[in-house]
Amino acid sequence: MCLFLFCLDASRQTKSDALTKKLKETYDLWASKPKSECDIGEHLKHLRRLAGESEIVVELGTRGMVSTLGLLMGLQENSKSVKKYLGVDLSYPDKTILNQIHRFATSARVDFQFILANDLEIDPVECDLLFIDTLHTYRQLTLELEKFSPKVKKYIAMHDTDEPWGWEDEPNFTAVTNNYPDWINPTKRGLFEAVEDFLARHPEWVKQEQHTNCHGFTVLKRV
């Protein structure tokens, strides 16, 4: 019995090691792709670093889950005893990709959860890092920042804060909700503007990083 359990544990460890290696290889592949092939590849290293300082990560807008690779790499590498990931998107990811990401998370000992939902209609959860890459409009990001920021302990990271959606709203999309409060200026456009206005309202947050490459990537830090 003892020998059987030892062999079983060894088999599980071998499988976990293989998945850990595969996660690293998949991350490296996407992180090395040029902007023409991957619109967030150049920022995976930032997500990895920020997640490396976090116990709980929330991702709003998972898309093809490439960004999730960076977050899982960081969670896997940190020394925290608690490691949790929550992804939220209006669309269900490709089943094969989602299953593979889930396996990667399990091998990294990350408590993994995906929710199919409108992020403006769910209750925010406390987290160390919030990453946002959803509908690229001023009003959408403004509402997300106001709703989720009170629950964020350390960092808020956002993609697409430079060209083309830094100063323009993404066209051809129906607003997720029409219940916009009166204090949102209906003439404002773009994610950069949404970030700047959020910072003006919330002195408890400061801009830590602003990268202009690969459509832009901005990091806010709680002070």
Model-derived features: positions:
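Boundary at the C-terminal end of the N-terminal hydrophobic targeting segment
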Residues: 10-12
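S-adenosylmethionine/decaboxylated-SAM
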Residues: 17-223
